Amino acid sequence: MIQIKLHNTKTRRREPFAPADPAHVKLYVCGPTVYDRAHLGNARTVVVFDTLVRLLRHLFPRVTYVRNITDIDDKINARAAETGETIGEITARTTSWFHEDMAALYCAPPDIEPRATGHIGDIIALIERLIARGHAYAAEGHVLFAVATDAEYGKFSGRSPEELLAGARVDVATYKRDPGDFVLWKPSPPDLPGWDSPWGRGRPGWHIECSAMIHATLGETIDIHGGGADLIFPHHENEIAQSCCAFPGSEFARVWVHAGMLQVDGQKMSKSLGNFRTVQDVLGEAPGEAVRFLLLKTHYRGVLDFSTAALAEAKRELDRFYRALEKHADPAPAATPPAAFIEALADDLNTPGAIAELHALADAAMQGDAASAAGLRAAGMLIGIFNHTADQWFRGEATDDARIDALIAERLAARRNKDFARADAIRAELAAAGILLEDGPGGTTWRRA
């Protein structure tokens, strides 16, 4: 059997992946905070872990993939205050947008998608456990984790006690015993979401939500914990502290995998620079399959530089692959992808190396080798491309079905929210692309003009 090796953030080494139970791999990835459109950085993380899960499913008999929805957060509260909408309206709409965008990038949904609001009881129970073990304390309606009680705190992210102290000195709350103590529970005023608890009406802190959802869905120790590199500190450092102190002897997560950052045209993506790109923006420029392919062309731990030129080049590469498949009348995929392709992916999810194998297979297929064409399709399908026939791709239908369905769903949501200007704009956008909508009692259908 091919051996997967992964760079483990915890040990700072690339290691052979050995799940606790080879018959059942358990994986958790931090999901979105649902208050706005998903941006390209969000998408990169989802595509990376979707690809890793595809590889794991190819090599192991059972994989349980959990990715949460953070639907309790001060950013959500602020957006509700800004727009006048209810928190429920905001989280429902933006969760729907997230699902539509990820589907347009051919990311399969996780096996379990817990929401923080669905696990308040688990969160309270975990906090009570930490208090009972002397690792947390109540103060002025808050509950805080006492970092001084965890000798391992800071080691995961490589921060010294001095660095941790320096980082915690900004706006230190008077109720904290130590400046670095972090919130597990905080009081909620009447106008914000809150739940009854032993410490009064309040809501959980962000970090405890993930620890509780992992324990509720996967148990004390999981095989892989993933997320973006920006979560290493404080989020993942704090998750480890909470979970390992609540369950002594537990590893919590055996392997930590982090996706690198994404920049646009060589600069950090930010609204102030005017280069902030949502998934929706980019799907208006290229098929979702091309966006996915671009996100896989850079190794997951490296910085990915997005540009319009890079997206166009990704589309051209896919054109070439589809030409190779077209030459063989869209062959059925081989029973298994070529070993060299799997070996590249198994080497710390080396997608650039795997894509080089796709090019070699396409070269051979263009020279008439039918087996290479079948291997090309099988390999591409494993990483989430070749979702269409060559004819569909070149007629533009690939842009297309997933994107059209996502826009129709967005239009429906806009109409429900009485945002008729947006609904009309979507209809006009689709009409300009030759897509005609027909609204009927059973919903909206579409056809090409």
Curated annotation (Swiss-Prot):
**For the motif 'HIGH' region, what are the positions?**
32-42
Q: What is its EC number?
A: 6.1.1.16
Known cofactor(s): Zn(2+)
Specify the domain of life of the species encoding this protein. Bacteria
User: Cofactor note, please?
Assistant: Binds 1 zinc ion per subunit.
Q: Any idea where this protein resides?
A: Cytoplasm
Give Gene Ontology CC terms. Answer: cytosol
* Entry's Gene Ontology BP terms: cysteinyl-tRNA aminoacylation
Instruction: Cite the Gene3D superfamilies for this sequence.
Output: Cysteine-tRNA ligase, C-terminal anti-codon recognition domain (1.20.120.1910), HUPs (3.40.50.620)
Motif 'KMSKS' region per record, residues? 268-272
Q: How does it assemble?
A: Monomer.
The entry's protein name is Cysteine--tRNA ligase
Recorded name of the encoding gene: cysS
